[in-house]
Protein backbone atom coordinates (compact mmCIF):
# COMPACT_ATOMS: atom_id res chain seq x y z
CA UNK A 1 0.00 0.00 0.00
CA UNK A 2 1.45 3.38 -0.96
CA UNK A 3 0.24 6.68 0.43
CA UNK A 4 1.43 9.76 2.26
CA UNK A 5 2.17 10.31 5.93
CA UNK A 6 2.84 13.87 7.12
CA UNK A 7 3.48 14.85 3.50
CA UNK A 8 6.01 12.05 2.90
CA UNK A 9 5.28 9.31 0.37
CA UNK A 10 5.60 5.88 1.97
CA UNK A 11 4.89 2.30 1.02
CA UNK A 12 3.90 -0.37 3.53
CA UNK A 13 4.83 -3.88 2.40
CA UNK A 14 4.33 -7.19 4.18
CA UNK A 15 7.39 -9.41 3.88
CA UNK A 16 6.36 -12.49 5.79
CA UNK A 17 8.61 -14.10 8.36
CA UNK A 18 12.36 -14.46 8.03
CA UNK A 19 15.42 -13.11 6.30
CA UNK A 20 14.78 -15.16 3.17
CA UNK A 21 11.52 -13.28 2.54
CA UNK A 22 13.11 -9.92 3.30
CA UNK A 23 15.89 -10.80 0.81
CA UNK A 24 13.25 -11.19 -1.91
CA UNK A 25 11.49 -7.91 -1.07
CA UNK A 26 14.70 -5.86 -0.80
CA UNK A 27 16.10 -7.17 -4.09
CA UNK A 28 12.83 -6.73 -5.96
CA UNK A 29 12.18 -3.20 -4.65
CA UNK A 30 15.74 -2.26 -5.59
CA UNK A 31 15.24 -3.77 -9.05
CA UNK A 32 12.03 -1.78 -9.58
CA UNK A 33 13.89 1.46 -8.91
CA UNK A 34 17.35 0.75 -10.31
CA UNK A 35 17.06 -1.66 -13.24
CA UNK A 36 15.78 -0.83 -16.72
CA UNK A 37 13.64 -3.87 -17.50
CA UNK A 38 13.61 -3.19 -21.25
CA UNK A 39 17.41 -3.34 -21.54
CA UNK A 40 17.93 -5.52 -18.45
CA UNK A 41 20.72 -3.18 -17.30
CA UNK A 42 21.30 -0.94 -14.30
CA UNK A 43 19.97 2.57 -14.67
CA UNK A 44 22.70 5.23 -14.79
CA UNK A 45 21.19 7.08 -11.80
CA UNK A 46 20.61 4.99 -8.67
CA UNK A 47 17.77 5.55 -6.22
CA UNK A 48 18.49 4.80 -2.58
CA UNK A 49 15.56 3.29 -0.70
CA UNK A 50 15.03 3.72 3.03
CA UNK A 51 13.56 0.53 4.48
CA UNK A 52 12.29 0.08 8.02
CA UNK A 53 11.30 -3.37 9.24
CA UNK A 54 8.59 -3.48 11.87
CA UNK A 55 7.85 -6.85 13.38
CA UNK A 56 7.79 -8.97 16.47
CA UNK A 57 10.60 -10.63 18.34
CA UNK A 58 11.18 -12.67 21.43
CA UNK A 59 13.26 -11.41 24.31
CA UNK A 60 15.96 -13.33 26.13
CA UNK A 61 17.37 -10.61 28.35
CA UNK A 62 15.73 -9.38 31.54
CA UNK A 63 15.68 -5.73 30.44
CA UNK A 64 13.29 -6.70 27.62
CA UNK A 65 10.12 -8.16 29.12
CA UNK A 66 7.26 -9.19 26.82
CA UNK A 67 5.68 -6.17 25.16
CA UNK A 68 8.85 -4.08 25.11
CA UNK A 69 9.45 -2.05 21.95
CA UNK A 70 12.97 -2.74 20.67
CA UNK A 71 15.04 -0.81 18.13
CA UNK A 72 17.93 -2.76 16.64
CA UNK A 73 21.31 -1.06 16.77
CA UNK A 74 22.84 -4.24 15.38
CA UNK A 75 21.48 -7.53 14.17
CA UNK A 76 23.21 -10.88 14.38
CA UNK A 77 22.04 -13.28 11.71
CA UNK A 78 22.12 -17.03 12.21
CA UNK A 79 20.65 -17.66 8.75
CA UNK A 80 23.85 -17.16 6.74
CA UNK A 81 22.10 -15.02 4.11
CA UNK A 82 24.73 -12.30 3.82
CA UNK A 83 27.43 -14.89 3.21
CA UNK A 84 26.00 -15.40 -0.30
CA UNK A 85 26.80 -11.80 -1.29
CA UNK A 86 30.16 -10.20 -2.14
CA UNK A 87 31.80 -7.68 0.22
CA UNK A 88 30.44 -9.45 3.31
CA UNK A 89 33.43 -8.43 5.43
CA UNK A 90 33.08 -4.77 4.41
CA UNK A 91 29.44 -4.71 5.50
CA UNK A 92 29.65 -6.72 8.72
CA UNK A 93 30.84 -5.75 12.19
CA UNK A 94 33.60 -8.34 12.39
CA UNK A 95 34.65 -7.43 15.95
CA UNK A 96 31.15 -8.02 17.33
CA UNK A 97 30.89 -11.28 15.37
CA UNK A 98 34.17 -12.51 16.83
CA UNK A 99 33.24 -11.49 20.38
CA UNK A 100 29.77 -13.02 20.11
CA UNK A 101 31.18 -16.35 18.91
CA UNK A 102 33.76 -16.28 21.70
CA UNK A 103 31.33 -15.46 24.50
CA UNK A 104 28.67 -18.01 23.51
CA UNK A 105 31.23 -20.67 22.54
CA UNK A 106 29.65 -20.84 19.09
CA UNK A 107 29.17 -24.29 17.60
CA UNK A 108 30.60 -24.07 14.05
CA UNK A 109 28.26 -26.86 12.90
CA UNK A 110 25.42 -24.35 13.12
CA UNK A 111 26.97 -22.07 10.48
CA UNK A 112 28.68 -18.71 10.52
CA UNK A 113 26.74 -15.89 12.22
CA UNK A 114 27.11 -12.36 10.90
CA UNK A 115 26.56 -8.96 12.50
CA UNK A 116 25.41 -5.80 10.72
CA UNK A 117 24.89 -2.30 12.09
CA UNK A 118 21.72 -0.32 11.67
CA UNK A 119 22.07 3.13 10.15
CA UNK A 120 22.47 5.30 13.29
CA UNK A 121 20.83 8.37 11.71
CA UNK A 122 17.79 6.34 10.65
CA UNK A 123 17.63 4.73 14.09
CA UNK A 124 17.62 8.16 15.76
CA UNK A 125 14.84 9.34 13.42
CA UNK A 126 12.47 6.43 14.03
CA UNK A 127 13.21 5.03 17.48
CA UNK A 128 11.28 6.57 20.36
CA UNK A 129 13.11 7.40 23.58
CA UNK A 130 11.23 4.68 25.48
CA UNK A 131 12.44 1.93 23.15
CA UNK A 132 15.18 -0.43 24.27
CA UNK A 133 18.10 -0.22 21.85
CA UNK A 134 20.38 -3.17 21.41
CA UNK A 135 21.25 -6.24 19.40
CA UNK A 136 18.57 -8.44 17.88
CA UNK A 137 19.08 -11.88 16.37
CA UNK A 138 17.64 -13.18 13.10
CA UNK A 139 17.20 -16.95 12.92
CA UNK A 140 16.65 -19.15 9.89
CA UNK A 141 13.76 -21.01 11.48
CA UNK A 142 11.23 -20.99 14.30
CA UNK A 143 11.96 -24.13 16.28
CA UNK A 144 15.57 -25.34 16.54
CA UNK A 145 17.22 -22.05 15.53
CA UNK A 146 15.32 -20.25 18.31
CA UNK A 147 15.99 -22.93 20.92
CA UNK A 148 12.62 -24.67 20.72
CA UNK A 149 12.80 -28.43 20.95
CA UNK A 150 9.95 -30.78 20.17
CA UNK A 151 11.32 -34.20 19.17
CA UNK A 152 14.51 -33.35 17.27
CA UNK A 153 17.34 -32.59 19.72
CA UNK A 154 19.13 -29.24 19.51
CA UNK A 155 22.78 -28.95 18.44
CA UNK A 156 23.36 -26.48 21.32
CA UNK A 157 20.62 -26.73 23.97
CA UNK A 158 22.25 -23.94 26.03
CA UNK A 159 22.50 -21.39 23.19
CA UNK A 160 19.65 -19.16 24.40
CA UNK A 161 21.10 -19.10 27.93
CA UNK A 162 24.48 -18.09 26.49
CA UNK A 163 22.85 -15.41 24.32
CA UNK A 164 21.05 -14.07 27.38
CA UNK A 165 24.44 -13.45 29.02
CA UNK A 166 26.04 -11.86 25.92
CA UNK A 167 27.31 -8.32 26.49
Where do the PLM segments sit?
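Metabolite-binding pocket within alpha/beta catalytic cores that recognizes anionic/polar moieties
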Residues: 1-114
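Active-site rim beta-loop-alpha module in soluble metabolic enzymes
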Residues: 95-167
Amino acid sequence: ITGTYKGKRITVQSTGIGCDNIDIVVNELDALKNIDFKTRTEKPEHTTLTLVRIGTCGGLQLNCPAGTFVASQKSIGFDGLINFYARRNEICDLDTEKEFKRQVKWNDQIGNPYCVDNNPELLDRIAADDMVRGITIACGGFYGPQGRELRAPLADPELNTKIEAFE
